[in-house]
Amino acid sequence: MFIGRERELQELNRLFESGRFEFAVIYGRRRVGKTALITQFIRDKDAIYFMGVESSSKQNLENLSKSIIEYSSGIEADTSFLSFQSALEYVFNLAETKRLILVIDEYPYVARASKSLASTLQMLIDRYRDSSKLMLILCGSSMSYMEDQVLAYKAPLYGRRSAQFKILPFNFSETCRYFPHFSPEEKALMYGIVGGTPQYLLQMNDRLSIEENIKNTFLNPNSAIYEDPSSLLKQEVREPSIYNAIITAVATGASRMAEISAKVGEDTSICSVYIKNLITLGIIRKESPYG
């Protein structure tokens, strides 16, 4: 079931219909529906889809090669390109005669394993952007990596993208579309508890009560949601213990910097750095009282 993301799909289709080289960056927290958006976008188009894995450069190159060869020949093969440059250049050349999409999902996994990948992409984009009809999409769940290593001014790929999409959780109106059988009050309660993360919303059942849904997910050690907060944080930060302490402090009522630092047991100057990172990651947000 695919819900929402009409504006993102419209913009992606606009880029696709330009017929010239385009480079889109899609990023956001895990579970917000980035891959679902891409799958929906490319479902009726010529596309090579490759998902990076947290493994070696060799393994990722082999997987990319399989995706490319399967697309171009229609058969699975065990052969591999000799380098990322030769694999990617082959795709750029393929796209000189037809419109083609190349998706590299979980790009941070691939780029961390192959340190020269960003520079290779930079070189190929500069070489082929006027002749290739390729639409390149880089997607990543590590927001810190995508912002620092792809979008930042000092990143090799800076200035070459056509568009960037920061995929956020759904708002209340979009979330309600998941729960046609809930009353307005139940929809509001569910949004307040779960938020708008699509993968979490799909695990809720609007045929059950709010209480039953909470027991089946948040309070069930076997559910997919149960361990998600800690695992997601570990993927983004180096010292999850301090971040967890800050999140716990905020969740238990500490709202001012002095209160948070007192509960955490660290100076406000230290806590402020961690809090800034949590805000950037979209885990907490700052609200100023009105009046």
Residue positions per predicted region:
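Phosphate-binding site recognition
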Residues: M1-G291
